[in-house]
Amino acid sequence: MKLDKESTVSLYIQLMHIIKEQIHNGTYLEGEQIPTEGELSKMYNISRITIRRAIEELCQQGYLKKIQGKGTFVEAPK
């Protein structure tokens, strides 16, 4: 999936939808570490601030869990 920079939908929301879809379709499995903010920034050519906002929202929704010094991991989809 690609981000549409011309869309009226915010980039962080588009990224959230992409990551959720990857969790649901098995690209990222429960307990698996997702790419770092820097890696995601390069993959999607968007700022780390945008990446961080999407990740924080997904953590609040229970899709991801950040572990200090280790990374961000997939939680069981609720």
Language-model features: locations:
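Extreme N-terminal segment that seeds HTH/winged-HTH DNA-binding domains in transcriptional regulators
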Residues: 1-46, 60, 65
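Residues in the helix-turn-helix
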Residues: 50
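Short, hydrophobic-biased segments on the C-terminal half of alpha helices
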Residues: 55-56
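Conserved segment of winged-helix/HTH DNA-binding domains
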Residues: 77-78
